[in-house]
């Protein structure tokens, strides 16, 4: 009882204590909560960061406000907030300045792949159940702010100062998810032999990776236990054991505690048991190997343990048999690369002020003191650069550079003429289109303020300093052609006048005629002929009386004697009316006697006007004559005055009695413009050099008096008034001094030394920018200077100087004994040596100097071996046996075993220890064979004239003709080893002559002479032509468009003066009465006259062919006439019609009159004495206007093919009826005359493509081997103009390089994993390297050669050695990579969604023991992009049903069976099952899971959708009995139709039990039919209402619907 009560008390106390503890805990928790709430009531709050202040760059600072506030929103003292969590008030920043915009920029990457939008909190989005085509995605890109110079990333705030940050993400669409697709499993592996538990496995590989959120790949491996394992018999071990070695430890030096390890034991910590391995050790004696100071030898160890085939550890003794594996070895202690301190920063590269505020660059460097050894840290960057800004207010502005040009050189017409005709040669002055060139160079641009103060011209610099395209160095130009004046015809000879009417002297005068300039001369050689001619004459008179006669007025009565009134006016030599006081005294009488015939008198007409003079001048043989005549109008009656004789009816007088020899002034060409000191002193223009260079000068010429047909005569024979000027002012051409640029800077000499023992020269040049002209200072002779570089020493060369190798260093004896238990100093060790850098004079140098000049550094450490007692020993190798001259011979060397090795069996294994070595003998027989294709035909290079600006001229590189083509030769020895072509006595090429056909242009004849004008009066056409001589071929210039006769024509308008040929008429013959028997002989008759066509230019007035005169204006040769009888009234001839107004107003009248000469005897009234008629246009009234032709084509001078020409148009006077008339008609009416009858024009020059010369051949594209090419290029200087030869497409030429052998280091394959005594575990793989010779591509045909031919070894230890592992039995290991799958595109509806496809490969793991499967690695899937992929689709395939079961699998469109890829929702059923079971006769379970009927039966379904029974189709050949018989006749049913309608004819439900759509359709259609029938019945049965209202007037029926159904 006591015990029980005691326990109860104890229990009560403990419960009370627990309750008390719980209450205290709650109190403390509440207090802490309240305190925490108190602390959390005050929080820190910060404002935005202010502007960055300070210097530009990273040295700025910015601040912000920080305060404490209560959670309710009011500000609190700072002490209420926790000071430890107070945010900082200041921070450093990068102050952005304006010039930083050139330093920093946003760098935007390409958009990444479109990825699915992640779900909330970064979780993967749940896969959509239905995805039709695409799903929403998101794609990102990287946006960062970069410093342009070194491409380093800086804060985004810097770039945001200049431009907003580009977006980093955007929405996109991606295809529906695609699951991982894998292949089918491989067959199960065979079970391993032996007893015990064994596993077998099977694997599959990845075909396509998961994309766009698809499912990951399933397991690629499966394992299972072998069936019926064989139990191990008694006495046999169930497990196998393997010695496993671990990785080597890091290299270290021995510690002091490892000095003496004698007698200690080493625990085998790798074993699961507590087995100890006891090893005895000798005492450690310290000794040191001599090592170079840079290399320290340490040691490294590894663990060794025994593992069982099930993966468990076992006793080490179960694995160690003959020899224990190596667990300790010497190694090189790691040593990092050692560099010097940074050098001081170099000066800022920008030492001037530019407008762009772009920064400069400064750098600093450091040198390598010692390279990394033993796997130490490699050397860091040795050069560092950063941007800098040169500060200072007095910085000079940065130089700017721009393209400059010289003046254009003289226009060279010959360049184009040679293109037209290669055989052209200069025979005289040439003109027309040409090409001119100029020099283009780059020079420093001087500011305007500096350029105005300095006299120095620009200095050429490197062309690379100028930005932008260079100006053109050539252009088309024109040398103006000279053309003489075009003058009018001569005027008529004027009267005989004094030479100077203002001061008449002497008794001799001159008769003169003039002509005027129609078109001025052009060009420097254009001349005008003389414009005035004179002939001397007697009795000159400057003023003459000109009298006009009135009609005859009878003095008494109406007939008999009378008088005429004479009206005289005084005219000067120009025909102008002047005062009568100037004419000679006395003036002509005012009255002149005349006679009026009486009634019976003979009546004669008035005198006609004097005819034109028969000759323009008189000579000894003939004189000029003029005639006038009158005719008998009426015969005399009885007692009347008789008619005059025929001689009295005509009068003659002399005219143009001056000589036919004319006098005129002839002038020489104007001389050059020369200075006139009086004039130029007043017209001074000061040039930049302070000398008078321009002004006004004078030109002079000589004047000669020429007598036609004689030559020069005395000047006094010619009238002084027409003497041309001999002096005229002119603009004195400016003197142009030669201007050259300043010399360029000397090309730099190498600093501070020159490589090689050659003479280095530096040069400079200058360019002529203006040639001297007009007596200016000539150009200097020296434009290029060269000199040797002075005080330049040879660059020192450096080389490595290795010391002797040290003795072989082994692991210290104490450590070797403690790890291996042996004291013999043998085995593998290391040798070291020191390597120093020395110059040519054996002086020590920095290691950096050798590293710059040499490729790598000689090795500092090498492996060595100290033979042990049990090792095999040999004699040294003998020398190789001599070689014979046979190329197939070999040479041999031998060695022998020595000592005890001769008795050891392992030493006699020739595969391990060969005693004989053989190698082929060198062969001196070489063969050559061609390689590659022939090069293009290469023409020999010509010399280029520097003065031609790089254009084609005679003697330049040819474009066609004979050339050479090349083919490379490969040289090899008899074994196929490539050697240098010189061994085959060859230059490396086969050369073959070739020909490039020369292009021939279309050749036309010269222009024929111009034909005569097609019109003899007015405007016509002149034609000239060319005809084809040679057709073009081989790319020559094409021909212009030719006519059917292979001719090309050119037509220009022409004008012939209408008075050039005129009709001359003689007087009418007397009127011949028709009836001669009549007396007196009067009445009607005919009269005739003689007409002839004469040339107005012919002095003699001789007749010409009548066809030259205008036939429309030919005068009548016969006309009707009348001879009035004595008793008849006689009237005078009709006067001329009065002039109509110029407007030809039809209301205006034209009038003519005549007067009575003799009244009739019987007082009959005479005829009318006046007539009027209206002014009708184009009948008796004409209007006149100037007619202009169109501008002609551009006319060039003779023998000129292009350039400046003249377009002309012709002016004629045209009557309103379209007839061309003399220009006098338009001139007399003062019509406005067009000003310009010619304008300059330009005929585009046909220019062949102008090319530069070929550049020098480039270096070979390969330093050795086959397939190397060298090339040269040329450039288009001036493209083709017009129909010139096109530029060749081949602007680059290539030819093969000589085939020289290539020597390369080749790495061998990795060796098997060497474990050095272990069975599995961690080991090392090595591979060797060798020097091979090849022809440019390393293949299996590469031949190993001497290593010296390949130079320094470029491989480091990491390339020649790598760690590896060998799995132990029982370990889980990974398989090799599978083959890459086919390239597959992502496609939607059979169309590619992306341009690149994907390939996949995988590797999985193999389980050897289920106990170790947790330690297996993960399976790996690797994907890479690919091109040339295809679109594949995946479909479900199924086998035939077998007992309502079948196999279903997914197959790719190329026939590959896969897992994945097909839609799981569309997977067909693999098991067929109907519920309820199909027990009706002739029924079976269909694929859809519902009961159907066999062939020949149709389904009768219940309303519930289940099968009621199977009904036999009538006419079916199936003889099975029906369940129910149908009444009626059995009609034959087409079985095919039955098959078509079988699936839906009587089945209202689909296989899923849902109502089919046709049921709804039939129901809806039936309902509509019923409504239609009811509505129709209603209309048929409805009674029509009688119409009781009175009919209204019918309105016309319209087509508008008014709502009445009856309509």
Curated annotation (Swiss-Prot):
Record: glycosylation sites: 150, 219, 683, 757, 842, 933, 985, 1105, 1187, 1199, 1309, 1335, 1457, 1525
Cellular compartments annotated: Membrane
Cleavable signal peptide: 1-31
Statement: the UniProt record of this protein carries the keyword Cytoplasm: no
Ranges facing Cytoplasmic side: 1578-1607
Spans through the membrane: 1557-1577
This protein's record includes keyword Glycoprotein: yes
Source species, domain of life: Eukaryota
Membrane topology: Single-pass type I membrane protein
Pfam family, one: TSP1_spondin
Assigned keywords, A-Z: Disulfide bond, Glycoprotein, Membrane, Repeat, Signal, Transmembrane, Transmembrane helix
Extracellular topological domain residue ranges: 32-1556
GO CC, alphabetical: membrane
Domain TSP type-1: 40-98, 102-177, 179-233, 336-392, 399-482, 484-543, 601-661, 662-735, 737-796, 797-869, 871-924, 925-999, 1001-1126, 1128-1182, 1183-1246, 1248-1303, 1304-1369, 1371-1432
PANTHER family in alphabetical order: SPONDIN, THROMBOSPONDIN TYPE-1 DOMAIN-CONTAINING PROTEIN 7B
Entry protein name: Thrombospondin type-1 domain-containing protein 7B
Species whose genome carries this gene: Mus musculus
Lineage: Eukaryota, Metazoa, Chordata, Craniata, Vertebrata
């Amino acid at each position: 009882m006591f015990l029980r009560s005691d326990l109860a008390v104890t229990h009560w106390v403990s419960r009370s204590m627990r309750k008390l503890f719980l209450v205290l805990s709650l109190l403390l928790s509440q207090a802490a909560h309240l305190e925490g709430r108190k602390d959390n009531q005050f929080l820190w709050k910060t404002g935005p960061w202010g502007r960055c202040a300070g210097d530009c760059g990273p040295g700025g600072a910015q601040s912000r406000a920080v305060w404490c506030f209560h959670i309710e929103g009011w500000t609190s003292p700072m002490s209420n907030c926790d000071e430890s969590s107070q945010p900082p008030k200041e921070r450093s920043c990068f102050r952005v300045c304006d010039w930083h915009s050139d330093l920093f920029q946003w760098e935007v990457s390409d958009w990444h792949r479109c990825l699915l939008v992640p779900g909330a909190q970064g979780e993967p989005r749940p896969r959509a159940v239905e995805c039709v085509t695409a799903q929403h995605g998101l794609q990102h890109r990287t946006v960062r702010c970069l410093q342009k110079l070194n491409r380093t990333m800086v804060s985004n705030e810097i770039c945001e100062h200049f431009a907003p940050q580009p977006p980093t993400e955007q929405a996109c669409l991606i295809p529906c998810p695609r699951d991982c697709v894998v292949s089918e499993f491989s067959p199960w592996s065979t079970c391993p032999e032996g007893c015990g538990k064994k596993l077998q496995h099977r694997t599959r590989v990845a075909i396509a990776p998961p994309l766009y959120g698809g499912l990951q790949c399933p397991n690629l491996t499966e394992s299972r236990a072998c069936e019926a394992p064989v139990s191990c018999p008694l006495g046999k071990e169930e497990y196998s054991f393997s010695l496993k070695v671990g990785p080597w430890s890091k290299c270290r030096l021995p510690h002091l505690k490892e000095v003496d390890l004698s007698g200690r034991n080493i625990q085998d910590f790798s074993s699961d048991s507590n087995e100890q391995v006891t090893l005895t050790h000798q005492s450690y004696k310290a000794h040191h190997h001599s090592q170079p100071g840079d290399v320290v030898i340490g040691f490294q160890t590894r663990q060794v343990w025994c593992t069982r085939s099930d993966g468990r550890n076992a006793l080490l003794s179960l694995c160690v048999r003959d020899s224990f594996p190596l667990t300790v070895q010497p190694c090189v202690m790691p040593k990092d690369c050692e560099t010097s301190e940074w050098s001081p920063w170099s000066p800022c590269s920008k030492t001037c002020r530019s407008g762009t505020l772009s920064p400069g660059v400064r750098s600093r460097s450091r040198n390598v003191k010692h390279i990394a050894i033993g796997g130490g840290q490699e050397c860091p960057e040795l050069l560092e650069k950063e941007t800098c800004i040169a500060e200072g207010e007095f910085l000079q502005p940065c130089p700017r550079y721009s393209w400059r040009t010289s003046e254009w050189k003289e226009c060279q017409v010959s360049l184009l003429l040679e293109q037209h005709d290669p055989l052209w040669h200069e025979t005289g002055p040439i003109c027309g289109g040409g090409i001119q060139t100029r020099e283009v160079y780059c020079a420093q641009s001087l500011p305007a303020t500096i350029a105005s103060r300095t006299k120095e011209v620009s200095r050429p610099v490197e062309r690379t300093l100028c930005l932008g395209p260079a100006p053109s160095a050539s252009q088309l130009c024109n040398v103006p052609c000279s053309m003489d004046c075009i003058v009018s015809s001569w005027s008529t000879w004027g009267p005989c006048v004094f030479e100077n009417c203002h001061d008449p002297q002497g008794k001799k005068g001159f008769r003169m005629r003039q002509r005027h300039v129609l078109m001025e001369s052009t060009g420097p050689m254009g001349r005008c002929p003389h414009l005035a001619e004179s002939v001397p004459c007697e009795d000159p008179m400057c003023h003459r009386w000109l009298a006009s006669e009135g009609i005859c007025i009878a003095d008494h009565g109406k007939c008999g004697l009378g008088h005429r009134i004479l009206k005289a006016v005084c005219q000067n030599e120009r025909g102008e009316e002047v005062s009568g006081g100037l004419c000679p005294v006395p003036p002509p009488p005012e009255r002149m006697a005349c006679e009026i015939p009486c009634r019976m008198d003979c009546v004669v007409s008035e005198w006609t006007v004097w005819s034109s003079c028969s000759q323009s001048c008189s000579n000894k043989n003939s004189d000029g004559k003029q005639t006038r005549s009158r005719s008998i109008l009426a015969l005399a009656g009885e007692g009347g005055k008789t008619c005059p004789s025929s001689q009295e009816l005509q009068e003659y007088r002399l005219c143009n009695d001056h000589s036919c020899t004319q006098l005129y002034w002839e002038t020489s060409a104007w001389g050059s413009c020369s200075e006139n000191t009086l004039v130029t002193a007043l017209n001074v223009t000061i040039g930049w050099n302070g000398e008078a260079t321009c002004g006004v000068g004078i030109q002079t010429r000589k004047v000669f008096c020429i007598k036609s047909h004689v030559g020069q005569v005395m000047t006094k024979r010619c009238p002084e008034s027409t003497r041309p000027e001999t002096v005229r002012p002119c603009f004195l051409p400016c003197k142009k001094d030669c201007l050259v640029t300043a010399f360029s800077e000397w090309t730099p000499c190498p600093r501070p030394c020159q490589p090689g023992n050659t003479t280095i020269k530096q040069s400079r040049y200058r360019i002529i920018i203006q040639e001297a002209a007009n007596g200016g200072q000539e150009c200097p002779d020296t434009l290029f200077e060269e000199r040797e570089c002075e005080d330049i020493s040879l660059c020192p060369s450096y080389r490595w100087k290795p010391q002797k190798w040290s003795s072989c260093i082994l692991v210290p004896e104490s450590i070797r004994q403690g790890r291996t238990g042996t004291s013999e100093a043998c085995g593998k060790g290391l040798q070291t040596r020191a390597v120093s850098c020395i110059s040519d004079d054996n002086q020590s140098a920095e290691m950096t100097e050798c590293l710059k000049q040499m490729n790598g550094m000689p090795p500092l450490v090498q492996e060595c071996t100290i033979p042990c007692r049990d090792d095999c020993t040999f004699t040294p190798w003998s020398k190789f046996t001599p070689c014979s001259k046979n190329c197939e011979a070999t040479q041999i060397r031998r060695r022998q075993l020595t000592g005890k090795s001769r008795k050891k069996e392992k030493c006699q294994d020739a595969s391990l220890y060969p005693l004989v070595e053989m190698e082929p003998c060198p062969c001196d027989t070489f063969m050559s064979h061609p390689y590659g294709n022939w090069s293009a035909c290469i023409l020999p290079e010509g010399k280029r004239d520097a003065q031609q600006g790089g254009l084609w001229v005679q003697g330049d590189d040819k474009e066609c003709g004979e050339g050479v083509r090349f083919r490379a030769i490969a040289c090899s020895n008899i074994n196929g080893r490539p050697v240098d072509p010189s061994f085959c006595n060859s230059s490396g090429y086969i050369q073959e002559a070739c020909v490039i056909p020369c292009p021939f242009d279309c050749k036309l004849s010269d222009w024929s002479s111009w034909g005569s004008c097609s019109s003899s009066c007015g405007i016509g056409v002149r034609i000239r032509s060319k005809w084809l001589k040679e057709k073009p071929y081989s790319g020559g210039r094409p021909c212009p468009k030719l006519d059917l006769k292979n001719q090309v024509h050119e037509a220009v308008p022409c004008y012939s003066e209408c008075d050039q040929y005129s009709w001359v008429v003689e007087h009418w013959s007397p009127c011949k009465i028709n009836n001669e028997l009549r007396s007196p002989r009067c009445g009607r008759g005919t009269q005739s006259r003689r007409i002839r066509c004469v040339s107005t230019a012919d002095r003699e007035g001789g007749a010409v062919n009548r066809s030259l005169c205008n036939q429309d204006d030919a005068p009548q040769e016969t006309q009707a006439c009348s001879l009035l009888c004595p008793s008849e009234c006689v009237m005078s001839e009709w006067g001329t019609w009065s002039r109509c107004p110029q407007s030809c107003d039809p209301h205006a009248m034209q009038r003519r009159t005549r007067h009575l000469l003799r009244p009739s005897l019987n007082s009959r009234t005479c005829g009318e004495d006046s007539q009027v008629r209206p002014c009708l246009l184009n009948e008796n009234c004409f209007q006149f206007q100037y007619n202009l032709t169109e501008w002609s084509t551009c006319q060039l001078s003779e023998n000129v093919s292009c350039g400046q020409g003249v377009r002309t148009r012709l002016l004629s006077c045209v009557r309103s009826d379209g007839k061309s008339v003399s220009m006098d008609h338009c001139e007399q009416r003062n019509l406005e005359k067009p000003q310009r009858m010619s304008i300059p024009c330009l005929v585009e020059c046909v220019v062949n493509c102008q090319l530069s010369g070929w550049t020098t051949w480039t270096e070979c594209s390969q330093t050795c081997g086959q397939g190397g090419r060298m090339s040269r290029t040329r450039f288009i200087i001036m493209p083709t103009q017009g129909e010139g030869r096109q530029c060749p497409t081949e602007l680059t030429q290539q030819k093969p390089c000589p085939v020289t052998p290539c020597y390369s280091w080749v790495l061998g394959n990795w060796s098997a994993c060497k474990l050095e005594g272990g069975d599995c575990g961690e080991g090392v793989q090595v591979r060797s390297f060798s020097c091979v010779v090849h022809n440019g591509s390393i293949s299996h045909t590469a031949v190993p050669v001497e290593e010296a031919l390949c130079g320094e070894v470029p491989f480091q230890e990491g390339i020649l050695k790598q760690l590896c592992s060998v799995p132990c039995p029982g370990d889980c290991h990974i398989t090799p990579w599978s083959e890459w799958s086919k390239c597959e595109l992502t496609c939607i509806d059979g169309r590619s969604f992306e341009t690149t496809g994907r390939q996949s490969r995988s590797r999985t793991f193999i389980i050897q023991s289920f106990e170790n499967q947790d330690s297996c690695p993960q399976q790996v899937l690797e994907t890479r992009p690919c091109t040339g992929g295809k679109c594949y689709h995946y479909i479900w395939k199924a086998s035939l049903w077998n007992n309502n079961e079948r196999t279903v699998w997914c197959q790719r469109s190329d026939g590959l069976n896969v897992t994945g890829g097909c839609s799981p929702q569309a997977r067909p059923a693999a098991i067929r099952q109907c519920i309820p079971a199909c027990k009706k006769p002739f029924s079976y379970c269909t694929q859809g899971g519902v009961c159907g009927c066999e062939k020949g039966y149709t389904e009768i379904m219940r309303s519930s959708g289940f099968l009621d029974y199977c009904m036999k189709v009538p006419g079916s050949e199936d003889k099975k009995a029906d369940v129910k018989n149908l009444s009626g006749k059995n009609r034959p049913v087409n079985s095919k139709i039955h098959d078509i309608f079988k699936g839906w004819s009587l089945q209202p439900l689909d296989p899923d039990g849902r109502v089919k759509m046709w049921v709804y359709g039939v129901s809806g259609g039936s309902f509509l039919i019923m409504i239609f029938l009811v509505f129709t019945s209603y209309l048929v049965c409805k009674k029509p209402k009688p119409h009781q209202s009175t009919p209204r007037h019918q309105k016309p029926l319209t087509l508008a619907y008014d709502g009445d159904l009856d309509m």
